[in-house]
Design a protein with these regions (language model features):
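Short alpha-helix boundary/capping elements
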Residues: 17, 68, 119-126, 208
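Short amphipathic alpha-helical segments
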Residues: 45-47, 73, 94, 201-202, ...
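Conserved helicase NTPase motor core
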Residues: 1-2, 32, 40, 60, ...
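P-loop NTPase Walker
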Residues: 1-79, 179, 233, 237
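Short, intrinsically disordered, charge-balanced linker/junction segments flanking boundaries
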Residues: 239-242
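ATP-hydrolysis module of ASCE/P-loop NTPase motor domains
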Residues: 56-58, 76-162
Length: 242
């Protein structure tokens, strides 16, 4: 479903969930609704409950990160203490900048930009050997990226992109775990689909298979709201993929 801002896209999702439950006899626990922000997920849940006149049904509403982290928690026993705080990630990059004796003009800005680039490489599933940094030489970026990954691993920490990458790897390597989640979530609905990145899309495609009951809502002209690494062309190619 493609439509502009304020046209009722969210309403379409909540009404579709109601229709699936009431008209199609779908088990509420097998429905997964994914959004991009925690606030959007909470609002969607509230609107759905209001629509159902207060009936609390076990439909899952959550962000990509919340949904995928819950999958990782069950597989690897992770908990909230494993999620890196922003200052921890920043400190790792700053220590690497000192270690590599890099001369940067504005350390805070440079650190922020490098973390954004690391996120982009993970989210778009890029090969590090073919990524050209906008902020430093390819050789230095590779050292920063690898140093960051090692430090995170040594500390037992995950960033938000790791949640996605690890979930992708888990589903790729453990068909039994993938099948269990495919059987749990038989109907998947996604809001603001134009903000999706490559790794999120690949996980969703695996999770939705083999039934492919995938319902997406987005605005093909919302590039101004683009999330980190979002690829609007994924949405535009959706009909070709399915």
């Amino acid at each position: 479903v493609l439509a502009g801002p304020g046209s009722g896209k969210t309403t379409v999702i909540t009404h579709r969930v109601k229709y699936l439950v009431e008209q199609c006899g779908v088990e509420p626990g097998s429905i997964l609704v994914i959004t991009f922000t925690k606030a959007a997920a909470q609002e969607m849940r509230q609107r759905f409950e209001k629509l159902m006149e207060g009936r609390r049904l076990p439909v899952s509403f959550g962000t990509f990160h919340a949904v995928f982290f819950s999958i990782l928690k069950r597989a690897y026993r992770y908990d909230a203490s494993n999620i890196a705080r922003e200052e921890q990630r920043t400190r790792i990059i700053r220590e690497l900048v000192d270690k590599l004796r890099m001369d940067v003009e504005d350390e805070a800005e440079f650190t922020s930009q490098i973390l954004t680039e690391i996120s982009l490489v993970k989210g778009e599933m890029m090969d590090l050997d073919y990524y050209y940094s906008k902020n430093c030489s390819e050789e230095l970026f590779k050292k920063l990226y690898q140093g960051y990954e090692k430090a995170m691993m040594d500390k037992g920490l995950l960033d938000f992109d790791d949640m996605l990458v690890l979930c992708y790897e888990l589903f790729t390597q453990r068909k039994d775990i993938l099948t269990a989640w495919q059987n749990k979530y038989r109907y998947i609905l996604i809001d603001e689909f134009q903000d999706i990145n490559r790794v999120q899309y690949e996980i969703v495609r695996m999770l939705a298979a083999p039934r492919n009951n995938l319902f997406i809502v987005g605005d093909d002209d919302q590039s101004i709201y683009r999330f980190r690494g979002a690829k609007p062309e994924i949405m535009l190619g959706f009909e070709k993929d399915y």
